[in-house]
UniProtKB/Swiss-Prot annotation:
Keywords: Cell inner membrane, Cell membrane, Electron transport, Membrane, Translocase, Transmembrane, Transmembrane helix, Transport. HAMAP family: RsxA_RnfA. The lineage of its organism: Bacteria, Pseudomonadati, Pseudomonadota, Gammaproteobacteria, Alteromonadales. It is a multi-pass membrane protein. It holds the Pfam family Rnf-Nqr. This is Ion-translocating oxidoreductase complex subunit A.
Amino acid sequence: MTEYLLLLISTVLVNNFVLVKFLGLCPFMGVSSKLESAIGMSMATTFVLTLASILSYLVNQYLLLPFDLSYLRTMSFILVIAVVVQFTEMVVQKTSAALHRALGIYLPLITTNCAVLGVALLNVNEKHDFIQSAIYGFGAAVGFSLVLILFSAMRERLAAADVPLPFKGGAIAMITAGLMSLAFMGFTGLVK
């Protein structure tokens, strides 16, 4: 049980996919201008990352490895992710049309979010079992969501702040992301 908790904490804080591994930067910068969109994207990404991580593990263990098809791993994981994203998009469209409109193009772009594929591939490389794969996927999603929501809240405050003209927009966003990354470096010694 302790091993699973350490894996979760490590994935969320110490080895954050956005700030440490630099995966998922496109939605991190693209959806973070409004807090409401960031929360919606976080929920959708959490669902997709967790489910895709579990399904990728199952596809790898019960389809690719037994038939010696490991060379198709990346392509099959992309297919699994695309199916999960389409399912998520249908659910979001049925449950919240406003959220579906707010997320716009970013919801289908979860398919190409490198963090989702990165989690699936790292699960295989780190030889996680089923429970570890689920926890790793969920932890990566929670870490992504945490950073996205915090960054979005900071960007909303920066939009209202008196920022010098050369730093407005993307420049101050990159500086803020760098400072967030430095703050998360404080968690480095937390899990060994």
